[in-house]
């Protein structure tokens, strides 16, 4: 898909739809293509804030610490935020985003252990638009 491997952009607009609720977030991150920021698996940081990620899915939940945002986060979240119940990021059990590593949950929210709003497995439909 040429929009993945050959289209430069200044920002991403990501949308997450659960049921009839669709919410959006703007991610300022200029790059030569989405392929260039994801395919090599290298971690690339951006920040839109924990609260913005939580606002994408009503009732979503994250652990309180770590809060790494970006591309190719810890444990294979392609675009999103990972959180942990410990101050380090070595064993995160929660995420909101796209390309999540859990079977049947590639976009959405998962949280286990010490979650802000209880354990979650929320499957979502994701949109990634480039500008």
Language-model segments: residues:
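Mature extracellular or lumenal effector domains of secreted proteins
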Residues: 1-131
């Amino acid at each position: 898909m040429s929009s993945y491997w050959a289209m430069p952009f200044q920002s991403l607009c990501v949308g997450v739809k659960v049921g009839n609720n669709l919410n959006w977030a703007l991610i300022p991150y200029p790059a030569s293509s989405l392929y260039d920021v994801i395919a090599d698996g290298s971690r690339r940081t951006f920040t839109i804030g924990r609260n913005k990620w939580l606002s994408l899915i009503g009732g979503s939940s994250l652990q309180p610490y770590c809060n790494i945002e970006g591309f190719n986060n810890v444990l294979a979240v392609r675009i999103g935020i990972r959180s942990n119940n410990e101050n380090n990021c070595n064993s995160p059990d929660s995420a909101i985003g796209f390309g999540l590593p859990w079977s049947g949950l590639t976009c959405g929210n998962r949280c286990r252990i010490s979650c802000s709003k209880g354990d979650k497995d929320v499957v979502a439909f994701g949109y990634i638009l480039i500008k």
